[in-house]
Each structure stands twice: as structure tokens, then as C-alpha cells.
Amino acid sequence: MGTLKRAAALLLALFAAAAFAAEGDGTLLPHSQKSFEAYAQDARAYVEANRRWVTEGALRAAELEANLPHEYMPEHPDGRAILLVHGLGDSPFTFDEIARDLAKEGILVRTVLLPGCGTKPADMMKVTQEDWRRTVEEQAGLLRARSKSFWIGGYSMGGDLAIDYAARHPGEVKGLVLFSPAAAVRSRLAALAVPASHVRDWITAPEERPNGGQNPLQYLITPTKGLAAFYRTMTAAQEGLEKLEKDRWRGRWFAALAARDGLVKTEALLPQFQRIAKGTRSAFLWYGTFPKGADAAGTRALPDAIGELKIAGFSHMALTYSERNPFYGKQGTVRFCWNGQGKAESLACEKGADVCFSGDGQQPEGAGGCAKLTWNPYYGEQLKAILSVMAEP
């Protein structure tokens, strides 16, 4: 979802005279498997054959595993199960820590790899909203058949797909677990993704970015057709929320939202979630100053400025990773240093300078240049809240 920050540039795409050539071969991850095991095997073969690799040597095995769907089988399963869906251009690794922790509590967890993801940005050229919806539909059906209590959740666009699924299958879903769901974005120009996709393939082409616009875990650029598919998915989630509210859906909710999310209009989503969840066993975490006039019932606000950790705000992507995460944690190997500060500060950050951390593109006055926060210092408290909502009577 990091590429959505470029939505404003879509206006320029409408007046482009020429399009960049697509680099993908148009093939997508196979579907319609009869078991999760077959799906996971096909995904492995597909990623191995089509991925543009970022790492080399021994690290490549970890890069591969991070981009594959996985099943996390509890030692003592209790009938609960949850399907977790990653965001636009992201990977199933988004949920690796959360999935392991939920499995320890008896919950069967599966992740998916959305079509167009896990290989290279150009493979988003022919992906559609229906491709993503079909993957969720198929994998939810397989997991639901293995469970007594079926849940679905997601991060960013994956949250949109989870909401859409719940709205279309309200009687089959026990509840939703959402992290920064992108059902309302801040950019007023997001709708231009659809017309822009007909006149230009890229805003920033892969050859213009290091590693072709990706890191080991996610894409850093997305073709306009992928952004158009995202917009349609967001619209479906908005319609799904309206349906759930109108039908007075009684499923449970957990949602984690950041006040300074630079991509999602979280202050608009929180009251809508609260209305739908009223009277159910649900919980919401709000990272930052509570919105003026918002209903605090069922919602816990946690400070997003933590001086001793040099944290000035939470970003869109920070919520699903703990500070121990080997890639995105406090001492992780991946840093997002180009976060709106000056070039010199960004370069110093890349060289390992001691920096502060903030929300998407946010640079507090006098902070000296903040990298984007990529981990959640409240990860443990967040996990407890999720387990409380998912607990069986």
C-alpha cells in the first residue's frame, strides 16, 4: 500500500502522450485448487519461476518464503480459524508474527498471496479486482470447511477484501480483524486511477527505481492498472460497510487504526466501524490523539508519540510488525528513509544514522529527519485485544 501515496500524480497520467511498455508476461497465479496444500504448491512454483529476486545466496530462501502463502497449524486446535489477507503489492509476510502468535492460542491461521503480488510490479498489469476477490473467496471457502468459527482479516487493501467478503457472506463470518483497512483514502484524486490506467501504464517505471521498484517483501511502485483495481476494491469495501450497517450485522470487530495514517482516512472509518459493531463483543485500538467528538466506547487510544523510542507518529504499515521483526523491527534490515525529509537527511538515514520515526511523509518540526515507522511498540497489547475479541464463551 505504500505506493498509494503517489495517487496525486495520477492527474498527470491523464495527459500523458505515451505509455511505458509493460514488462509482465500477463500470467497470474493459478487458481481453483481443491485444497490449500495444492494452492500453496502452485504458488511456490509460480513465484520461483516469475519473481525478480532482490537478494542473493542464503537470503533468497527467506525472500521466497516471505512471499508465499502459509498455514500456521496450532498444536491444540480449538475450531477457530482465520484467513489473513495482505495489502496492495505486499506479501503474506505482513502477518507472519501475528499468525504464529494466534496459532499458539489454538487458532488455525492461513495467509494468501494475491494475484500480481510476490513476483514483480509489472505482473500487476493485468490483475483485476475480481482476481483478488476470487482468491479470497476460494481460500475462505476451504478454510471455513475446516473450522467451527471462521474469521477473516486483512491489512490495508486486504482489509477491504475482508470487509467485502463479510458483506457478501454475513452468516458465515464470526468476525473481522482489520489493520489500517483502506476503505477510505485521503487523496481526492484516487478515483483518477481508473481513467489513468487507460492512457499510461506507469507513474514511475521499474527501471527508474532501485531493484526494479521492490524490496524483498513488497513492491514500492504499482502500475496504474493495479491502482485502478485497488480503487474498485476500495469502492466495494465502502459498499460492503454500508450493507453491514443497513443489515445490522452482528459479527465481532477488531480494528487497529493510526491517527497519522498518511494514506487512509482513519478518522472517518472509526465512527462507521463503531456504529456497525455496537452491541457486539468488539474492540478498536486508536494510535494517536482521539478524534474530537468521537465516541470512546469500546475504543482504546494509545499515544503515538513516544519520546524514549524517538517515535513521533505511527505510519500506515507499522501496525502488524513487532519491534523484534527481523526486517521491519526496531533493529530490522529494511528502513524507509525517504519520508519527506531532505536528501542529505535521507542519505544519512540509509547509512545508519540515529533517526526518529514518524507517520507517512510526516516530518515534525525540529526532529532532524524521521524515517517511516515500520513496527508497533504496542504489538503485545494489540495481540491481547485481538485474542479478547476472538475468545469463545
Kindly label every feature range from the protein language model:
Residues 9-18:
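Bacterial N-terminal signal peptides
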Residues 73-76, 221-365, 374-387:
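Serine-hydrolase catalytic core
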